[in-house]
Every structure is written in structure tokens, then in C-alpha cells.
Regions:
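A conserved beta-strand-loop-helix scaffold within acyl/acetyltransferase catalytic domains
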Residues: 3-79, 125-151, 155, 159-283
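Acyl-donor binding region in acyl/amide transferases
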Residues: 51-52, 58-59, 71-151, 265-324, ...
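Short intrinsically disordered coil segments
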Residues: 107, 169-177, 343-349
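A short, structure-level motif marking secondary-structure boundaries and short turns
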Residues: 167-168, 222, 279-281, 296-298, ...
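Low-complexity, flexible helical/coil segments
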Residues: 41-43, 90-94, 102-105, 155-160, ...
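Active-site/acyl-donor-binding loops of N-acyltransferases
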Residues: 3-7, 11, 132-165, 303-363, ...
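Short linear elements at protein peripheries
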Residues: 366-376
């Protein structure tokens, strides 16, 4: 059967695809691509002046692929995916097993779109995703686009085969003791851990997340999240919480939230979005307790994998040693701005190469370089 594409430039057109879009996100096990999340991001977080350029792929009347891009405002025409800069492991969607034909069709459609792309970015995409390279190979024209890689980051994951008890038994005795002690201490002080499910508690949880998160990062140079994250969470929660596609784990003490951790879920995959917690009660380990509860819950639901998101921070590595890296990559088609675009990407490329070289360098050499740098 032949495939056809449709370029979607108006929000109301995209909203009409919400049901098959959701089904596709579940089929692809891609929580970051859930429509309730990405539409809320578009309404509240997308840069002002952005243009919607989503490519839908149909087989007869069935949606078999969706690449929800937007044009980032600026002199250079950058095509980015909805959720870029906010959510990790975002990706276009395609019926499994048909990624190549669908991605190739999306690439050809974008090549003819207006405004013409100077750059197509895949930010925080799974490093194993075939989409960027298929774009390189399928983009029409005499010359292939140049593919760049701006950065690669570890992204810890936990396979949920077996049961929670089996996983916990495999962790170190020290980890088990610390978690049990933290739970007991919270209970002794009258605290609790639970999911926010009712509209009133959901609203309280999203507000508490924003308050706790931004307060924590205020003295550390600020958060990478937009200030509009509360509006994003509120909007998304109205669509996602009831179906279990958004989970707000709240650690409370004396009726006051100590931690709110936000997770997205689709197709057997749980993705950690972010959290906010009260550092003044760090002795109770509220962030670890919320993560522990979310993992136990994911096991109970029979899910396949738990994704901790980008960054191999120490608290994540207490739960797992598995890694599924994510990368910031993209393509630069041969347009009139090709050379200028490559030139502007050069600093990011240089930083990435230096980082790669540094990681491969013997540790003794790295220490010596740091000593020399400190003397200057």
C-alpha cells in the first residue's frame, strides 16, 4: 500500500490526530512523544514566534508515522522537534519495522517545506535511533547533508525483567539498608509517599514541583527548565494523569511537600522528567524515596524499562549500571547558508571532540593537564 504525507502547520490539525498519535507513542514506547505532553509544551514552552511544521505519514487513513517539528525563530532556519530543550529521548514516531521508509518520506517532505531548513536537529535522541542517518541518506539533492554531533550524554536505564524483589536483592546490602532506613525515618516523622491523582492534589503537586525545583536551582546559576514549566505540567496533567501516562510522586511531611518527581509513561517505558525537593530536609532523602517508589510501581505495572533521563549523576547510579546514551545531533542540508551554518556549529563540534579526546586520555595525563591549567 502506498504512503502519503501531510504537512501540518496549524495546531487544530495536529490536535485532530491526538488519538492515533497517542497509540503510536505507545507502540513505539516513547513517553516523550505523547501528544498530551508535546501539545502542552507547544502551548506553553515553545519559543515565541515558532512555526509548526509537523509531518504526518498515512497509509490509507491510518497514521503510521509522525515527525512533529517546528521552526525555531531566528535568522537561521532550524527545524526542531516538539519538546526540544525540555525533554530527553524525544523522537519522531514510526510503526516499528517501517522506520526507514517512513523516515525517508518525512525527510523528502521537509526538504520541500517552507521556510527551507538550514538545519534539522534531533536533540536528546537515543543514540541508536536510525532517524538522523536516514535523513542524511534520503535528503534529495546533488549533495548529501552534513551530519553533526554536538554532544553525547550517558542516560541510565533499568530493565524491569523479573520482579521488584529480585531487583532489590541484586542491589548492594548498603543500598537496601539506606533505603529501608530512609523509609522508616520518614514514617516515624509522620511523612508519606504517594501518587497525586485527584485534580486538587495534582494542581498542588505541579505547583510544588515548580516552587521546589526553582528554589533549589536559584543559587546554582538557574534551572535549564523554562519558568512556564508549571503551566506545561498543569496542562499535560489534565490529559495524562488519569491514564497513568504522567505520574506525580509526592513525598510529604506535615502536609508539606518535600519532593515532587514527575514521570511520563508509554508502551511499557517510564521516563523520569525531573524533580523538585526541599534541600533543608535532605536528611530524609526525599528524592531517592520518590525514585524508589516510582521504580517499585513500574515493576508492579509490568513495565519493560525505567529511563532515568540524561546524565549519569550519582543518585541514578545507585539504582542501575545500565546505560542507553542520548545525543544532540542533526543534519545541515546544502542551502545558501550551508557554509555559514557549519561555521556557527564549529565551536560545539570542537568542544565535543575535545571532550571525546579527554575521555580517552589516560587518567594520569588528565591530572597533569589539570595541574598545569591551575598554575595559569
Amino acid at each position: 500500500m502506498s504512503l502519503r504525507t501531510e504537512m501540518i502547520e496549524r495546531l487544530e490539525q495536529l490536535v485532530q490526530l491526538e488519538r492515533p498519535w497517542r497509540d503510536l507513542a505507545h507502540t513505539c514506547s516513547c513517553p516523550a512523544a505523547l501528544p498530551g505532553w508535546q501539545l502542552a509544551w507547544w502551548r506553553h514552552v515553545a519559543p515565541e514566534g515558532s512555526l509548526l511544521r509537523a509531518v504526518a505519514v498515512f497509509e490509507n487513513k491510518d497514521l503510521v508515522g509522525l515527525a512533529p517539528f517546528f521552526v525555531n525563530p531566528g535568522r537561521r532556519v532550524d527545524y526542531r522537534l516538539l519538546g526540544a530543550g525540555t525533554t530527553h529521548r524525544i523522537s519522531p514516531l514510526a510503526v516499528p519495522g517501517r522506520e526507514r521508509e517512513i523516515a525517508a518520506l518525512v525527510a523528502r517532505t521537509l526538504a520541500g517545506s517552507s521556510p527551507r531548513p538550514d538545519l534539522v536537529a534531533f536533540e536528546g535522541i537515543d543514540i541508536a535511533s536510525p532517524w538522523p542517518q536516514i535523513f542524511v541518506e534520503s535528503w534529495p539533492g546533488r549533495f548529501r547533508p552534513w551530519r553533526y554531533v554536538a554532544s553525547i550524554h550517558a542516560a541510565p536505564v533499568l530493565g524491569l525483567a523479573g520482579g521488584f524483589a529480585e531487583w532489590l536483592a541484586a542491589r548492594s546490602g548498603n543500598f537496601r539498608r539506606k533505603m529501608a532506613q530512609a523509609r522508616r525515618r520518614l514514617e516515624v516523622e509522620g511523612g508519606s509517599i504517594g501518587l497525586a491523582l485527584e485534580p486538587a492534589t495534582v494542581e498542588q503537586a505541579t505547583q510544588a514541583f515548580a516552587d521546589l525545583h526553582f528554589r533549589r536551582w536559584q543559587g546554582r546559576g538557574g534551572s535549564s527548565l523554562a519558568q512556564s514549566v508549571h503551566a506545561l505540567l498543569d496542562d499535560a496533567a489534565a490529559d495524562l494523569v488519569e491514564r497513568g501516562e504522567m505520574r506525580l510522586w509526592v513525598v510529604e511531611l506535615g502536609g508539606r511537600p518535600l519532593c515532587v518527581s514527575v514521570f511520563l509513561a508509554a508502551g511499557g517505558e517510564t521516563l523520569s522528567f525531573n524533580s523538585g525537593f526541599d534541600e533543608s530536609r535532605g536528611d530524609l532523602k526525599p528524592g531517592l524515596l520518590a525514585m524508589f517508589a516510582a521504580i517499585e510501581d513500574a515493576f508492579a505495572r509490568g513495565e519493560r524499562r525505567f529511563d532515568f533521563g540524561g546524565g549519569a549523576t550519582s543518585y541514578k547510579l545507585r539504582f542501575t549500571s545500565e546505560d542507553a546514551p542520548i545525543c544532540w545531533t542533526g543534519i545541515v542540508p546544502h542551502t545558501g547558508r550551508y557554509q555559514l551554518t557549519r561555521l556557527r556549529l564549529a565551536p560545539d563540534q570542537a568542544r565535543w571532540l575535545i571532550t571525546r579526546i579527554g575521555r580517552r586520555m589516560p587518567s594520569a595525563w588528565r591530572r597533569q593537564i589539570k595541574r598545569i591549567a591551575r598554575r595559569r
